[in-house]
């Protein structure tokens, strides 16, 4: 359809591509609301990259990242990258319900002293017990943009996008703060399974309207009075899956269309005690103090986490 050349910063010009009517993405229905395109990226000195399933929505700017692997690199690139169905259109396992606040036991299951925004999230591409699944080190903001682009449509009202991004970030920061998976003996922050966490898709495209919201509020999370940890804000689509006392994605779209603000949408589902809080930023992957200093010659899980 198109052949483009990147500029000095590695970006192409914007192009327009056909997509289904925008209204398909504003109400649940049987028609796929986005077009799918295949992208081939080639550059001298690099291995070619094929991406299958880039999603394009009507009236929305899609951004397709493409990280190339050098010819001299002995590690083959993932080729092709296949982007599966969007969670609102495809079939995925429903979220297994959890308590929105994790217990703080005397044994110290929760030991991070403050809520922090990690520089990097370690994403396990599968269920927690799937030892064959890969772990990916993903910058926090890139992770949130990917998840939001996989979980909601970028054509939705900005207040709806903001409410959903806040829920995604608070859920993620709860996993960081509680060291949920590390305390179970795993070396990752979160999974890509919708049954346990939310959907992250390796190599997928994101959307400009979602990216802008994340950049504006990436250090925010959701709180309740007297609770230190970010709230584990669970949600579902509200059409294929029902989830009382959780936010429904299609319902949040409707509320945004009615003029509800982000916090009004969130309180509609999670209650009036919910409020927006701000976290500290931090470099690296947060991990609690192991009970002893790490020095030259130290070994074990805590050293591996820091590495």
PLM features: what roles do these ranges have?
Residues 17, 40-53, 58-307:
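Conserved, single-site charged/polar hotspot
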Residues 2-26:
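Short, acidic Ser/Thr/Gly-rich low-complexity loop/linker segments typical of extracellular
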Residues 5-7, 30-34, 57-59:
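Surface-exposed coil/turn segments at beta-strand junctions on protein surfaces, enriched
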Residues 10, 32, 248:
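Short, conserved glycine- and acidic-residue-centered signature motifs
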Residues 1-2, 80:
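Charged, low-complexity interaction regions that mediate assembly/partner binding
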């Amino acid at each position: 359809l198109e052949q483009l050349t990147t500029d000095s910063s590695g970006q192409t010009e914007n192009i327009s591509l056909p997509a289904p009517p925008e209204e398909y993405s504003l109400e649940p229905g049987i028609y796929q609301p986005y077009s799918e395109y295949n992208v081939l990226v080639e550059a001298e000195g690099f291995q070619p990259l094929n991406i299958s399933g880039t999603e394009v929505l009507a009236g929305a700017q899609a951004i397709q990242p493409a990280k190339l692997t050098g010819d001299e690199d002995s590690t083959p690139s993932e080729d092709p990258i296949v982007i599966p169905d969007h969670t609102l259109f495809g079939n995925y396992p429903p979220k297994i319900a959890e308590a929105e606040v994790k217990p703080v036991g005397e044994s110290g299951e929760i030991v991070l002293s403050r809520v922090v925004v990690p520089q990097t999230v370690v994403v396990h591409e599968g269920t927690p017990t799937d030892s064959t699944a890969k772990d990916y080190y993903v910058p926090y903001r890139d992770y949130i943009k990917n998840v939001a682009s996989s979980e909601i449509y970028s054509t939705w009202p900005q207040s709806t996008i903001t409410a959903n991004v806040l829920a995604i970030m608070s859920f993620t920061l709860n996993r960081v703060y509680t060291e949920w998976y590390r305390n179970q003996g795993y070396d990752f922050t979160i999974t890509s399974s919708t049954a346990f966490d939310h959907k992250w898709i390796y190599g997928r495209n994101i959307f400009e309207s979602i990216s802008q919201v994340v950049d504006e509020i990436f250090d925010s999370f959701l709180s309740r009075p007297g609770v230190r940890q970010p709230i584990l804000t669970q949600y579902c689509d509200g059409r294929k899956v029902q989830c009382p006392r959780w936010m429904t994605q299609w319902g949040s779209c409707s509320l945004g269309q009615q003029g509800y603000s982000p916090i009004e949408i969130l309180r509609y589902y999670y209650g009036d005690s919910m409020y927006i809080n701000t976290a500290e930023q931090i470099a690296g992957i947060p991990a609690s103090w192991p009970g002893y200093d790490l020095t030259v010659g130290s070994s074990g899980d805590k050293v591996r986490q820091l590495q």
